[in-house]
């Protein structure tokens, strides 16, 4: 049984991410929520934060976004975001650079200090794993 769901992130610059994934955790405007294949259809606003993508091989990728919207169907998730930064890289210096860009992107879009601290903590913890 295929338990993967199609996921894409689109910004004004184009498609940032596209692929089949096991699950996605999104920064909803009312709190984080997870989506698996077969999820009920919904449309949600997203706040600045981190999208946690669990791939088929159970590895995780993080993408920081500023505000946007998510459209969820039973077999597809589409995120439309104003901006996005992929928090990964081939070496430590590239990861550090992308992490700094992600923090700057989120900081520029949010004035909620508690939300900023939680998001930065998630980014820092992901870098250590």
From Swiss-Prot:
Compartments where found:
Cell inner membrane
Q: Which domain of life is it from?
A: Bacteria
Membrane topology designation: Peripheral membrane protein
> In which broad location class does this protein mainly occur, judging by the first location in its UniProt entry?
membrane
Cysteines joined through disulfide linkages: none
The protein's UniProt keywords, in alphabetical order, are: ATP synthesis, Cell inner membrane, Cell membrane, CF(1), Hydrogen ion transport, Ion transport, Membrane, Transport
Which CDD domains does the record associate with it?
A: F1-ATPase_delta
Q: Which InterPro entries does this chain map to?
A: ATP_synth_F1_dsu/esu (IPR001469), ATP_synth_F1_dsu/esu_N (IPR020546), ATPsynth_dsu/esu_N (IPR036771)
The record's section on Pfam families has: ATP-synt_DE_N
User: Which GO terms of the molecular function aspect are on file?
Assistant: ATP binding; proton-transporting ATP synthase activity, rotational mechanism
List the GO cellular component terms. Answer: plasma membrane; proton-transporting ATP synthase complex
Family annotation (Gene3D superfamilies): F0F1 ATP synthase delta/epsilon subunit, N-terminal
Q: How does it assemble?
A: F-type ATPases have 2 components, CF(1) - the catalytic core - and CF(0) - the membrane proton channel. CF(1) has five subunits: alpha(3), beta(3), gamma(1), delta(1), epsilon(1). CF(0) has three main subunits: a, b and c.
Q: Which NCBIfam families match?
A: ATP_synt_epsi
Summary of the function given for this chain in its UniProt record: Produces ATP from ADP in the presence of a proton gradient across the membrane.
The family line of this record is: Belongs to the ATPase epsilon chain family.
What is the protein name stated in its UniProt record?
Answer: ATP synthase epsilon chain
| Species per Swiss-Prot/TrEMBL record | Campylobacter jejuni subsp. jejuni serotype O:2 (strain ATCC 700819 / NCTC 11168)
* Gene name for this UniProt entry: atpC
């Amino acid at each position: 049984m295929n338990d993967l769901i199609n996921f894409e992130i689109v910004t004004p610059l184009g498609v940032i991410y596209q692929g089949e994934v096991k699950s996605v955790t999104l920064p909803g405007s009312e709190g984080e929520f997870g989506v698996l294949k077969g999820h009920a259809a919904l449309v949600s606003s997203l706040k600045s934060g981190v999208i946690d993508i669990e791939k088929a091989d159970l590895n995780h990728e993080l993408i920081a976004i500023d505000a946007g919207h998510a459209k969820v169907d039973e077999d597809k998730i589409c995120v439309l975001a104003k901006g996005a930064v992929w928090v990964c890289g081939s070496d430590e210096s590239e990861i550090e650079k992308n992490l700094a860009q992600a923090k700057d992107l989120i900081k520029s879009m949010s004035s909620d200090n508690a939300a900023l601290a939680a998001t930065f903590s998630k980014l820092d913890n992901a870098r250590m794993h």
